[in-house]
Amino acid sequence: MIRQRTLKSIVQTTGVGLHSGRKVTLILRPAAANTGVIYRRTDLNPPVDFPADANSVRDTMLCTALVNEDGVRISTVEHLNAALAGMGIDNVIIEVDAPEIPIMDGSASPFIYLLQSAGIDTLNAPKRFLRIKKPVRIEDGDKWAELVPFNGFRLDFTIDFNHPAIDADQQRLVLDFSSQSFIKDISRARTFGFMRDIEYLQSQNLALGGSFDNAIVLDDYRILNDDGLRFDNELVTHKVLDAIGDLYMCGHNIIGEMRAYKSGHALNNQLLRAVLADQEAYEWATFQAEEVPVTFAQPGMVLA
């Protein structure tokens, strides 16, 4: 059977909080089968746990946050969640001594490195996949996102970014997901934003950790980062990275195809909630090794 995965060892790193601009320590711990993905704030007494859950997600102008019934939140979870999806990690405890996951370089690549450093351990329990059985679509004005049946995991994403520095032919990406494709083609894509928005947020004491070190920053005419883009389609690639993390808020890899136009965290989350609210739209699936879609056949141990 295809088995659940966790980490082999505890790993730790430090980074800067996007909101606070302060140092954040991040610790990833192995977890037993069927634990799921648990985010934990250790700066609170007692510590507060936030299980990955589509219904706990709150989208903000800056990031994705998980919020519990008491209104306590943990922010900026999206890129680490994408890395967990990319590596197929089912069970992990994620500890931070702050209200947010560190932003690192604005991509998922540092988290991939951290997970690979910990190593992957397989557990004696079947891995459960969420298989899409019928199309589900969410629309918001001209924006839309849908999940349809597909024997694998494919993402077909289009953005519409009218900017002189962004080529019109670099605004669509179709990806057949695998751990290898995520690590090689997706994980290094950074988040992006406009200088005017960052300056405004910082004037309001927000986004104090935002910088050229952890985002692609644009003005009305050009990309302001000295090194430019890591690859020509980095912006749409980051939107795909975000979607992979958003869909993994159900705690399971999805078997299906996501198609989207101008979608973001909020629409992605609405789509996942709509699927989970319709019991005829999905089923839980486990696989023997020879049955699994090739997408999910190999753990992601390729070095980034």
Curated annotation (Swiss-Prot):
- Swiss-Prot/TrEMBL keywords: Hydrolase, Lipid A biosynthesis, Lipid biosynthesis, Lipid metabolism, Metal-binding, Zinc
Q: Does the keyword Cell cycle apply?
A: no
Catalysed reactions, as listed in the record: a UDP-3-O-[(3R)-3-hydroxyacyl]-N-acetyl-alpha-D-glucosamine + H2O = a UDP-3-O-[(3R)-3-hydroxyacyl]-alpha-D-glucosamine + acetate
* Pathway the protein acts in: Glycolipid biosynthesis; lipid IV(A) biosynthesis; lipid IV(A) from (3R)-3-hydroxytetradecanoyl-[acyl-carrier-protein] and UDP-N-acetyl-alpha-D-glucosamine: step 2/6
Q: Which cofactor does it need?
A: Zn(2+)
Family annotation (Gene3D superfamilies): lpxc deacetylase, domain 1, lpxc deacetylase, domain 2
Q: Which residues form the active site?
A: 265 (proton donor)
Under InterPro entries, the record lists: Ribosomal_Su5_D2-typ_SF, UDP-acyl_GlcNac_deAcase, UDP-acyl_GlcNac_deAcase_C, UDP-acyl_N-AcGlcN_deAcase_N
Query: Under the GO molecular function aspect, what terms does this record hold?
Result: metal ion binding; UDP-3-O-acyl-N-acetylglucosamine deacetylase activity
Gene Ontology CC: one annotated term: membrane
- Write down the EC number: 3.5.1.108
Q: Which SUPFAM superfamilies match?
A: Ribosomal protein S5 domain 2-like (SSF54211)
- Which Pfam families does the record associate with it? LpxC
Binding-site residues for Zn(2+), renumbered to this chain: 79, 238, 242
The answer to keyword Hydrolase applying to this record is yes
Q: Which GO terms describe its biological process?
A: lipid A biosynthetic process
| Purpose | Catalyzes the hydrolysis of UDP-3-O-myristoyl-N-acetylglucosamine to form UDP-3-O-myristoylglucosamine and acetate, the committed step in lipid A biosynthesis.
**Would you identify the family this protein belongs to, as annotated?**
Belongs to the LpxC family.
HAMAP family of this UniProt entry?
LpxC (MF_00388)
Name of the protein described by the UniProt record:
UDP-3-O-acyl-N-acetylglucosamine deacetylase
Q: Which organism is it from?
A: Photobacterium profundum (strain SS9)
